[in-house]
A protein has these predicted regions:
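Residue-level recognition of pore/gate-forming positions within transmembrane alpha-helices
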Residues: 38-42, 102-106, 128-131, 178-182
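Structural motif at transmembrane-helix junctions in multi-pass transporters
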Residues: 27-32, 83-100, 172
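Hydrophobic/small/kink-forming positions within alpha-helical transmembrane segments
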Residues: 16, 20, 46, 75, ...
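Membrane-interface interhelical linkers
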Residues: 1-10, 43-71, 122, 174, ...
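Specific transmembrane alpha-helical segments of multi-pass solute transporters/efflux pumps
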Residues: 57-95, 137
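C-terminal transmembrane-helix exit sites in multi-pass transporters
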Residues: 87, 104-123
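Glycine-/small-residue-enriched transmembrane alpha-helix faces in small-molecule transporters
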Residues: 1-32, 136-165
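Hydrophobic transmembrane alpha-helices of multi-pass small-molecule transport proteins
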Residues: 45, 123-139, 152
Length: 190
């Protein structure tokens, strides 16, 4: 197995274990956990930028009002996504948290078609229809409207759509997003 495959495997293992971690923190206020996640993500991302010597792009981004607004919007959307996900898992609604990530691609497709005027082929439409039927079947089995799953899935789809307007590398982008919501997190912690 090559290095890239091992990295992908490692990511999926960590991603799969993440709900267990959040569930272990169920006794802690979810908003506090979210605030800590933002703070530590920001610190870690800043460290990565400094190590990779990419830190000099931050002042240029901070001077650009349009970019600041875009990063703030992305930061707020990822904060909603992270926060609702943490809350969903902490309250034992694991199935709903999982369902969100089945809904997300469908939301992304709708956004792509409506906002970016992307077109799907007939085969792609069949795939979307099958995915939609599968998600709706899961929703019916769930027994109620999985509103937290909708919030998680939709917030991540909107986040992805906004990210199309960001030209920076991924580590710069997530750093700026967490930096933009850092005052909210610090305000909550203090």
């Amino acid at each position: 197995m090559n290095r890239s495959s091992l990295q992908v495997l490692g990511c999926y293992i960590l991603w799969g274990l993440l709900p267990v971690f959040w569930k272990l923190l169920a006794g802690v206020n979810s908003a506090y956990v979210l605030a800590q996640r933002i703070v530590f993500s920001c610190v870690f991302c800043l460290a990565v930028l400094l190590i990779k010597k990419n830190g000099k792009v931050v002042p240029a981004i901070l001077r650009d009002k349009k970019q600041r607004r875009l990063y703030l919007c992305c930061g707020l959307l990822i904060t909603v996504n992270w926060g609702v996900y943490i809350l969903t898992v902490a309250t034992g609604r694991i199935l709903e948290a999982s369902l969100a990530y089945y809904m997300n691609p469908l939301f992304s497709i709708v956004i792509g078609a409506l906002i970016f005027k992307e077109r799907l082929s007939a085969v792609q439409w069949v795939s979307v229809a099958l995915a939609f039927v599968g998600v709706m079947y899961s929703v019916v089995l769930y027994g109620s409207v999985p509103y937290l799953a909708v919030i998680i899935g939709l917030s991540f789809a909107l986040y992805g759509a906004l990210k199309k307007g960001i030209k920076a590398e991924s580590e710069v982008s997530i750093c700026m997003e967490t930096l933009s919501v850092l005052p909210l997190a610090l305000g909550f912690i203090v």
